[in-house]
C-alpha cells in the first residue's frame, strides 16, 4: 500500500517498439499493475517511439497483443485512449522542443553548438588521459549574444541539461533507501538532439509529469540516469514521482537476461505453448515473496495481496526449468476443455490434425489425450509432441544406429529383443486374443488397466517382460504414456490394427 499518497496513484510502463516485445516489459508491467491495483490507482501504457532508427514496423501492435494475451490490462494507452493522451511520443513531438527551450530560459539547460569533430576529439583526449567520457561544458558559458548569433546563422545545435558542478543528488528509492551521486561526475546530458527529437531523458520526464505519474517502477539499470531526471524535475520546478527500481532479471551466471542465453521475446513463450497464467505467475516470483512459501497463484491473487516492500534485490534468476514447473501446475489446474482448445493448434502443428475445426467426438478424444499428457508436460507444445502415441497408427520399429549413445542403444536392444523372447511373443498373442473377445470398441481407463493386468495373472510374469513387447507393437517406442491410457484413448479396433500391421511388417512369429 502507499500510505503517504496524497494524489491518485498512477503508474506506467513505456516500452519502445524496436522488435519483439520483451519479457522484461511484462515483468515491469506486472509490478506496476499490482501496485496501482492495490492502491486503487491507474496503470497506463505509453509507447516511446522517438528513436526512429530502431523503430520496427508492427512492433507496437505486438506490444499491445502481448500485454493483452497476458491479461496485463491498462486503463489508458495508444489503442484505448485516455484523458492524458496522446500516448505515443511521436505524437507529442512538439511538446519536447517547447519544454526544452523553456528549460533554457529558466537556466536549467543550454544550447550546445559543438560539432561531431570536436566531440570526437574530446573523447579521444579523455581516453588518452584515462578520463571517463563526458561533455566538457564548452558551450555552457556562451554569452547571450554568441548564442543568438549562432542561432541566426543556422548553426546546428543540441540542448543540454545544465548539471550542477558541485554538491550531490540524492535518489530516495523505495527499495534501496537513499542513493547518493556526486554531481561533478555526471555530464551535461543531451535533452534535445540536432534533428529536433528528444532524448529519452527529456521525453520521459515531460511525459511522466504531464500524465500525472506518481510512482516510477522500473528496472534498476535506470538508477545511473535517475540523478539527471531528478535535476530535470528541479529545473522545471516540478514534483518528482517516487522512484522504485526493480531488480534485473538474470541468467544463470547472474548476467543480465539476454537473448543469447535465454529467450526474451514474449512471442516465443506464447508460440512454445506457455500458458499466460504460468508465465505471469513465474514473473510474479521474480524478486518477490508472495508469502508463506506459496509459489502458485493467479494474477488476481497476486494483485490483491501485493506489497511492493516485499520485493527483494538479490537479482532473480530467470530459470526456464522453474518456469516449466510453474506452467505445469497451471496446466493441471486449468479447466480441461479450455486447455484442450488451447492445445488444438499445437496438435495441428504436429500434423496430428488437419485443421483446428474438430467435431464434438474428436474434441472428446482430444480431451482424453490432454487430460493424460498434461500431468507431465511443461508446455502445450511439449504436450502435443508427447501425444504421438495417441494419433499415429502407422509406424516402424526403431533400428540400431552407429550414432546412438549407450543409453539409447540399450533401450532399443531391449525393445527388439522383447519381440524375440518367448514370453514377449506369448504376451502379444494373448493380448490380441483378449482384444478380439472384448465386447465393443471402447474402454474406460479402469477397464483398460484391468485387461492389461489380467495378462500378468495369466502368464505369471513381471510387467517388464509382458508390457515391453506390447508397447513395441502398439506404439513402436520403448517408453511413453501408460499403456492403459493409450488403449483407453485409441480403443479396440485401432489397437488391433496397429498390432497386426507391425506383426505382419516385421514377420513376428506369434
Curated annotation (Swiss-Prot):
<protein>
    <recommendedName>
        <fullName>Glutamate--tRNA ligase</fullName>
        <ecNumber>6.1.1.17</ecNumber>
    </recommendedName>
</protein>
<keyword id="KW-0547">Nucleotide-binding</keyword>
<dbReference type="InterPro" id="IPR014729">
    <property type="entry name" value="Rossmann-like_a/b/a_fold"/>
</dbReference>
<dbReference type="InterPro" id="IPR020751">
    <property type="entry name" value="aa-tRNA-synth_I_codon-bd_sub2"/>
</dbReference>
<dbReference type="GO" id="GO:0000049">
    <property type="term" value="F:tRNA binding"/>
</dbReference>
<feature type="short sequence motif" description="'KMSKS' region">
    <location>
        <begin position="256"/>
        <end position="260"/>
    </location>
</feature>
<dbReference type="InterPro" id="IPR020058">
    <property type="entry name" value="Glu/Gln-tRNA-synth_Ib_cat-dom"/>
</dbReference>
<feature type="binding site">
    <location>
        <position position="259"/>
    </location>
    <ligand>
        <name>ATP</name>
    </ligand>
</feature>
<dbReference type="InterPro" id="IPR008925">
    <property type="entry name" value="aa_tRNA-synth_I_cd-bd_sf"/>
</dbReference>
<keyword id="KW-0963">Cytoplasm</keyword>
<dbReference type="Pfam" id="PF00749">
    <property type="entry name" value="tRNA-synt_1c"/>
</dbReference>
<dbReference type="InterPro" id="IPR004527">
    <property type="entry name" value="Glu-tRNA-ligase_bac/mito"/>
</dbReference>
<dbReference type="GO" id="GO:0008270">
    <property type="term" value="F:zinc ion binding"/>
</dbReference>
<dbReference type="InterPro" id="IPR045462">
    <property type="entry name" value="aa-tRNA-synth_I_cd-bd"/>
</dbReference>
<dbReference type="InterPro" id="IPR000924">
    <property type="entry name" value="Glu/Gln-tRNA-synth"/>
</dbReference>
<comment type="similarity">
    <text>Belongs to the class-I aminoacyl-tRNA synthetase family. Glutamate--tRNA ligase type 1 subfamily.</text>
</comment>
<dbReference type="Pfam" id="PF19269">
    <property type="entry name" value="Anticodon_2"/>
</dbReference>
<comment type="function">
    <text>Catalyzes the attachment of glutamate to tRNA(Glu) in a two-step reaction: glutamate is first activated by ATP to form Glu-AMP and then transferred to the acceptor end of tRNA(Glu).</text>
</comment>
<dbReference type="InterPro" id="IPR049940">
    <property type="entry name" value="GluQ/Sye"/>
</dbReference>
<keyword id="KW-0648">Protein biosynthesis</keyword>
<dbReference type="GO" id="GO:0005829">
    <property type="term" value="C:cytosol"/>
</dbReference>
<keyword id="KW-0436">Ligase</keyword>
<keyword id="KW-0067">ATP-binding</keyword>
<dbReference type="GO" id="GO:0004818">
    <property type="term" value="F:glutamate-tRNA ligase activity"/>
</dbReference>
<dbReference type="InterPro" id="IPR033910">
    <property type="entry name" value="GluRS_core"/>
</dbReference>
<dbReference type="InterPro" id="IPR001412">
    <property type="entry name" value="aa-tRNA-synth_I_CS"/>
</dbReference>
<feature type="short sequence motif" description="'HIGH' region">
    <location>
        <begin position="15"/>
        <end position="25"/>
    </location>
</feature>
<keyword id="KW-0030">Aminoacyl-tRNA synthetase</keyword>
<dbReference type="GO" id="GO:0005524">
    <property type="term" value="F:ATP binding"/>
</dbReference>
<comment type="subunit">
    <text>Monomer.</text>
</comment>
<dbReference type="GO" id="GO:0006424">
    <property type="term" value="P:glutamyl-tRNA aminoacylation"/>
</dbReference>
